[in-house]
């Protein structure tokens, strides 16, 4: 496989034992695909499938008026272009959305004629609100902030059977139940009670006997019994009777009388149990019927009504028990043949028969009335209402929808195959068969369903969730339209008069803005972004709640294999409810998670890949990815470890159907980034996966020396890097953009052959981290499509780089690494290894108040000039100013109206428009504990308000930059185009041209160079074809110029029009501060194996433990953090990192030697490193220059990839260490024989430590829990309104709570005065605290404690209970 432009620069040596059969799929595909299907914006109207918006419209329309004389039909919809692009929406605080317009048709019918005919048709486009658009990276911009819609894992629609696990009844009896869950509509439950009567309930209301439902769907007691039971046939005799003999029904029964054959020979004696031999003898005797005594008939249940053949009178009813009197009545009526229900205690229970007895309804109508009374208690059951309600419950498409998934699940569970054909509502057959399966379960046949099986839980993606919301909005519109349609004819209304888009906009806005599944995007680093978009949550509307979710739902299920990650889930109350999709997982058409497998054909593992859902997978035997194969792809071992239906087993190779695609397929993106994951305890791996998402991007990202090979995929798919859309040559590079001249073969004729990539510079992310892109190509580089052109935050040469590679020593150091603390060398801080830039956005708004408008100004009274010296004339801070806490960023004054004005003064003020003389200073200041540099200022002004100088200059700058951009583009485009034209023209014959060019002359470069390039188009070529091409080129250039002018005008219009601001706001100013955060004690750091800790001390370099050659350790970790936590992966990472660095040193040594033999010796060494073990790298495909560039990039260490579950073995690490540290080097550095430990020296004393220390390189991260954000102190500040106690928390600038336990402590010490001070003047004694402040100012430290306000609150509370409480001084 050829290396891409960036991969060539630094090849990652992989230890994988097997080739990748399938690449990791695009990681954001689920989100993007789902929303694309929802919108279908680029699909022609006729080609749109019935999904998303199309489905929502077609399910609601046509809307018919109540009298049926008018209807509103849906024709098509179209999405307009969004007004602002993503970046502009983020700056202005707007939603990135496009307007939705639907073409609808109003049809009015003529009521005069016998059959209605169409009288009039009006068609019109109607605005239906704005639909938010997804950005290219799968997020939405809502009100200026990026949000993600998380997919929801919910219970699939369908029919489910379960039991209560014996918890309901004290006897521990299993009570079976069934539930039919539609996509929308009423739930239908069936359940047994402890007495084995079967009930049903609708929407969890009160239960009723199930036979009421069966009668309501039109069955009679006879047909119900016939459906659920087999019958025994009897012929009545004057005494006893004859019974039809069915052998299998007698097996295991007690004989209640002697059973004889035809000859009278007794085969089974009375009170003996009938066994198989008896049955064989009876069959041999040819017995068809058996004579039974009278009492054998007693207690049996009649299957049909018994009618007197002469009079037609009913002698006995179906489901009646046979008693002596019933028998006599039947004999009296000359009834010969009767049928009874066949039941037994073992596997044919009389449940439906018992239920019929409990049911008091007589016929279909009575049953439906009973259901109506349950659903609508207290309403009189009119016949039409009863019918309508019953139809709407399960049979109306408007109110009940199983959905395709539901229909498929119902069909497959009731044994009708796996297709989704059939109506989307319930049918009578569905109800009957569900009850039948439930009765069979109670009889001991069949299996209950596992609701945590991923075949019974499906994923609702963005598109589907948005569609449901849109539909809800349309339903509200439908009601309003129905009412107005009646008046449509009389008032001559048009479609747009009928449809109000407000409900739709409101529903969409509510969903994207405040739904539980619409979340503020986690944007700390690229990994957290990508993980957030691949998240699957069981919470949210229609899902579970934290409190009600039990252990089973949260647990790892065998079907999670390859679909949902068993490792990555939050710690805390949401554990197991929020999951991450596995690396290769995708959704199928029904929304079930699928995972890929390699098919095995004729015992050979093929490269054919099939995606299987959890249901399909249960039918196959699947081998693991690490099963040993020979060269032909056959299994080597006689027994192969496999999975079948969730169980692990060993089986012969012949029985295996599929094989895993890759060992990493069971884990998620974050977990697949942990090297040596297989050596870590699961709990720690979970922490490691979660903490990588909190890593703060460092100023200079550094690739991990030990990675897993997924780093490149994550960096590229996350969208933080810039990828080439087409191949070509880099024409121009600077910090802001990369310009690429596209290859001729990739360029479409007539299009611009230039791609310009504008880079994102110092932009704030949602978590205030810094997003900044840096170009990694140089002018003249050849790049191919998909190559990385620029690195983003936390990426290094197109690979994810969350932290830094640190030299780690595992040893205790004077207690400074007690309990996971981390000791760090000062050199790390000095080299800015963990320095990060954070961007804070501070906003100030000038509003229109009752007393006059607030004003942004530099003219603020009571402020010294030193405090204003960073503001310009408009009162806004300069870009580049360095500011610290309490500095003024934007000067603002607000009118304050303490003085009551007389009416005359008010009038004068109103006439002369003089604003109130009293103003208070409400300027925007830097909040406490923050220092930084102003990097950007944005001023937004309401339409109709005059812009200040600063706002105008910002707009001018923006326009100038844009114009320059366009001019550059134009220049490049024109140069490119003219180059192509020149190539075409040189050497061609002409018919004539400028400067008296003769006919038949041949064009030369010199002649063309002499002309102005636009004059080239005046040349008349002899060849007709080339002349056409020349004309086309001219047209395309002119068109391009025109396009650019239009684009500039558009931009200017956008910038100069007033900004949309919230009501009452005149101006809004945003100031962006860049804050540099260096590593300091109190910051949280972690490795990738869940080994987290807090920096305890930053030690001078000279005091750190160092090696024999003087290299000091960067970080000293406590070795006691490893054994009990069982995350040994970190130790292996340290060893392999040590080898990686050592190999880098060896390469650096070679490069220092003579120039001539360099490439050859380096190539030889690289071959050894890359191709001794693991998967091989193609070093031979590189040129000498490329080899040397590669070697130069490898000087700081060769990056290794050790894929999850397929990584480097101990032996391979050993080999690498030997390559990296030959004997002479090892001796010089005083390494142990294994090269994995070294003798270290104490930096303070110079003495050698008493035993060797494990030392090596680990990729260590700085997490987003920075001490600067947590550190907080307060002297005076805001107080709570009612209790007058200080507020709590840093955000409110609150105090530290002196709680109940702290009071106990002071009481225990008897420190009464301290206690009094804490509970009064330092808290809520208002007069007392004022006095103390005055006393301190005077220098007189006296405390005068009074009554705490909270005590007064208590007194008030007691008074509100009508108890008067007075305090008397004694």
Curated annotation (Swiss-Prot):
Its EC number is 2.7.7.6. InterPro entries: DNA-dir_RNA_pol_bsu_ext_1_sf (IPR042107), DNA-dir_RNA_pol_bsu_external_1 (IPR019462), DNA-dir_RNA_pol_su2 (IPR015712), DNA-dir_RNAP_su2_dom (IPR007120), DNA-dir_RNAP_su2_hyb_sf (IPR037033), RNA_pol_bsu_bac (IPR010243), RNA_pol_bsu_CS (IPR007121), RNA_pol_bsu_protrusion (IPR007644). It catalyses: RNA(n) + a ribonucleoside 5'-triphosphate = RNA(n+1) + diphosphate. GO terms for molecular function: DNA binding; DNA-directed RNA polymerase activity; ribonucleoside binding. GO terms for biological process: DNA-templated transcription. Keywords: DNA-directed RNA polymerase, Nucleotidyltransferase, Transcription, Transferase. SUPFAM superfamilies: beta and beta-prime subunits of DNA dependent RNA-polymerase (SSF64484). Belongs to the RNA polymerase beta chain family. DNA-dependent RNA polymerase catalyzes the transcription of DNA into RNA using the four ribonucleoside triphosphates as substrates. The RNAP catalytic core consists of 2 alpha, 1 beta, 1 beta' and 1 omega subunit. When a sigma factor is associated with the core the holoenzyme is formed, which can initiate transcription. This is DNA-directed RNA polymerase subunit beta.
């Amino acid at each position: 496989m050829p290396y891409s432009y960036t991969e060539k620069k630094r090849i990652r040596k992989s230890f994988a034992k097997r080739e990748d059969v399938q690449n990791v799929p695009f990681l954001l595909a689920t989100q993007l695909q789902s929303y694309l299907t929802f919108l279908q914006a680029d699909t022609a109207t006729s080609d749109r499938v019935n999904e998303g918006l199309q489905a929502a419209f077609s399910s609601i329309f046509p809307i018919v008026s109540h009298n049926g004389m008018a209807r509103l039909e849906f024709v098509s919809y179209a999405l307009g272009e969004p007004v602002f692009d993503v970046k502009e929406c983020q700056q202005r605080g707007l939603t990135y959305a496009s307007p939705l317009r639907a073409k609808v048709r109003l049809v009015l019918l003529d009521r005069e004629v016998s059959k209605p005919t169409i009288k009039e048709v009006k068609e019109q486009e109607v605005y239906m609100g704005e639909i938010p658009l997804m950005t290219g990276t799968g997020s939405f911009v809502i009100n200026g902030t990026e949000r993600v819609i998380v997919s929801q894992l919910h219970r699939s629609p369908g029919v489910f059977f379960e039991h209560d696990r014996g918890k309901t009844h004290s006897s521990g009896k299993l009570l079976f139940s069934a539930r039919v869950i539609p996509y929308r509509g009423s739930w239908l439950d069936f359940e047994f009670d402890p007495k084995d009567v079967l009930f049903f309930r609708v929407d969890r209301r009160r239960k009723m006997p199930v036979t009421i439902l069966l009668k309501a769907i039109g069955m009679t007691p006879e047909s119900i019994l016939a459906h659920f039971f087999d019958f025994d046939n009897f012929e009545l005799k004057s005494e006893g009777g004859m019974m039809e003999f069915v052998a299998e029904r007698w097996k295991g029964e007690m004989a209640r009388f002697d059973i004889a054959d035809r000859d009278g020979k007794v085969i089974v004696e009375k009170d003996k149990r009938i066994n198989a031999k008896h049955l064989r003898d009876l069959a041999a005797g040819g017995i068809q019927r058996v004579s039974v005594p009278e009492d054998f008939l007693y207690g049996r249940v009649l299957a049909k009504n018994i009618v007197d053949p002469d009079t037609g009178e009913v002698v006995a009813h179906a489901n009646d028990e046979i008693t002596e009197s019933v028998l006599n009545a039947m004999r009296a009526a000359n009834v010969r043949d009767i049928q009874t229900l066949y039941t037994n205690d073992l596997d044919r229970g009389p449940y439906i028969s018992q239920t019929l007895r409990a049911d008091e309804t007589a016929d279909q109508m009575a049953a439906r009335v009973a259901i109506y009374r349950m659903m609508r208690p207290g309403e009189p059951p009119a016949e039409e209402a009863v019918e309508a309600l019953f139809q709407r419950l399960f049979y109306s498409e408007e109110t009940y929808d199983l959905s395709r998934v539901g229909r498929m699940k119902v069909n497959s569970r009731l044994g009708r195959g796996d297709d989704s054909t059939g109506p989307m509502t319930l049918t009578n057959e569905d109800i009957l068969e569900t009850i039948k399966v439930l009765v069979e379960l109670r009889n001991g046949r069949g299996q209950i369903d596992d609701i945590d099986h991923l075949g019974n839980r499906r994923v609702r993606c963005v598109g589907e969730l948005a569609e449901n919301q849109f539909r809800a909005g349309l339903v509200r519109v439908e009601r309003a339209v129905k009412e107005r349609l009646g008046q449509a004819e009389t008032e001559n209304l048009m479609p747009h008069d009928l449809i109000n888009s407000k409900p739709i906009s409101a529903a969409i806005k509510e969903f994207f803005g405040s739904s539980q599944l619409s979340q503020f995007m986690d944007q700390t680093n690229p990994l957290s972004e990508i993980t957030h978009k691949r998240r699957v949550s069981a919470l949210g509307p229609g899902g579970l709640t934290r409190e009600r979710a039990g252990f089973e739902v949260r647990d790892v299920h065998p079907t999670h294999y390859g679909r949902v990650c068993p490792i990555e889930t939050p710690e805390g109350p949401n554990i197991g409810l929020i999951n991450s999709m596995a690396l290769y997982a995708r959704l199928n058409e029904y929304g079930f998670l699928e995972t890929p497998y390699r098919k095995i054909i004729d015992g050979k593992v093929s490269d054919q890949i099939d995606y299987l859902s959890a249901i399909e997978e249960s039918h196959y035997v699947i081998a693991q990815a690490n099963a040993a194969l020979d060269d032909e792809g056959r299994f080597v071992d006689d027994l192969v470890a496999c999975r079948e239906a969730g169980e692990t087993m060993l089986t012969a190779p012949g029985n295996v159907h599929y094989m895993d695609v890759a060992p990493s397929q069971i884990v998620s993106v974050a977990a697949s980034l942990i090297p040596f994951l297989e050596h870590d305890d699961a709990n720690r791996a979970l922490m490691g996966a979660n903490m990588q998402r909190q890593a703060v991007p460092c100023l200079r990202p550094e690739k991990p020396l030990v990675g897993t090979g997924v780093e490149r995929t994550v960096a590229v798919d996350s969208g933080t890097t810039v990828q080439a859309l087409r191949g070509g040559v880099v024409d121009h590079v600077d910090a802001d953009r990369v310009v690429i001249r596209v290859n001729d073969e990739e360029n479409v004729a007539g299009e611009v052959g230039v791609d310009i990539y504008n880079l994102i510079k110092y932009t704030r992310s949602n978590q205030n981290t810094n997003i900044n892109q840096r170009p990694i190509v140089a002018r003249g580089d050849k790049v191919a499509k998909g190559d990385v052109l620029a690195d983003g935050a936390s990426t290094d040469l197109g690979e994810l780089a969350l932290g830094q590679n640190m030299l780690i020593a595992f040893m205790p150091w004077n207690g400074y690494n007690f309990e996971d603390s981390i000791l760090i060398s000062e050199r790390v801080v000095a080299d800015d290894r963990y320095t990060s830039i954070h961007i804070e956005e501070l906003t100030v708004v000038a509003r229109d108040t009752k007393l006059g408008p607030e004003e942004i100004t530099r003219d603020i009274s009571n402020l010294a000039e030193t405090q204003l010296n960073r503001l310009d004339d408009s009162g806004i801070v300069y870009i580049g100013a360095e500011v610290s806490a309490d500095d003024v960023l934007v000067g603002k004054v607000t009118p304050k109206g303490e003085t009551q004005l007389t009416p005359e003064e008010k009038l004068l003020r109103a006439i002369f428009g003089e604003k109130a003389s009293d103003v208070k200073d409400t300027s925007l200041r830097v909040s406490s504990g923050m220092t930084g540099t102003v990097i950007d200022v944005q001023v937004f002004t309401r339409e109709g308000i005059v812009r200040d100088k600063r706002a105008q200059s910002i707009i001018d700058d923006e326009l100038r930059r844009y114009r320059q951009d366009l001019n550059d583009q134009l220049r490049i485009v024109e140069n490119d185009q003219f180059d192509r034209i020149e190539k075409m023209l040189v050497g061609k014959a002409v018919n004539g041209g400028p400067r008296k060019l003769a006919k038949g002359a041949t064009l030369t470069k010199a002649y063309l160079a002499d002309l102005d390039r636009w004059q080239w188009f005046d040349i008349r070529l002899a060849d007709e074809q080339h002349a056409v091409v020349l004309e086309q080129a001219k047209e395309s250039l002119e068109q391009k110029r025109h396009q650019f002018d239009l684009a500039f005008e558009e931009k200017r219009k956008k910038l100069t029009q007033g900004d949309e601001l919230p009501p009452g706001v005149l101006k809004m100013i945003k100031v962006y501060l860049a804050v540099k955060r260096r590593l300091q004690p109190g910051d949280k750091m972690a490795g990738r194996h869940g080994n987290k800790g807090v920096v305890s001390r930053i030690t001078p370099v000279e005091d750190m433990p160092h090696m024999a050659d003087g290299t000091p350790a960067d970080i000293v970790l406590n070795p006691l953090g490893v054994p009990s936590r069982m995350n040994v992966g970190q130790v292996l990472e340290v060893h392999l990192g040590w080898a990686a660095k050592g190999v880098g040193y060896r390469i650096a040594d070679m490069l220092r030697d003579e120039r001539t033999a360099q490439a050859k010796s380096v190539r030889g060494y690289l071959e050894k490193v890359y191709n001794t073990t693991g998967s091989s790298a193609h070093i031979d495909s590189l040129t000498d220059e490329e080899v040397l560039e590669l070697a130069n990039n490898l000087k700081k260490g060769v990056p290794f990839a050790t894929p999850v579950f397929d990584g480097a073995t101990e032996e391979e690490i050993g080999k690498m260490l030997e390559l990296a540290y030959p004997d002479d080097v090892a001796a010089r550095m005083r390494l142990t024989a294994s090269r994995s430990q070294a003798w270290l020296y104490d930096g303070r004393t110079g003495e050698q430590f008493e035993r060797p220390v494990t030392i090596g390189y680990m990729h260590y991260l700085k997490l987003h829990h920075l001490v600067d954000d947590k550190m907080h102190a307060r002297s005076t500040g805001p107080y709570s309104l009612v209790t007058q106690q200080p507020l709590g928390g840093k955000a409110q600038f609150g105090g530290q709570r002196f709680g109940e336990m702290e009071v106990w402590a002071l009481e225990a010490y008897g420190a009464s005065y301290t206690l009094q001070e804490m509970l009064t003047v330092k808290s809520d004694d208002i007069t007392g605290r004022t006095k103390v402040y005055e006393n301190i100012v005077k220098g007189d430290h006296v405390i005068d404690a009074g009554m705490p306000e909270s005590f007064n609150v208590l007194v008030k509370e007691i008074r509100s209970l009508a108890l008067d409480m007075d305090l008397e001084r004694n």
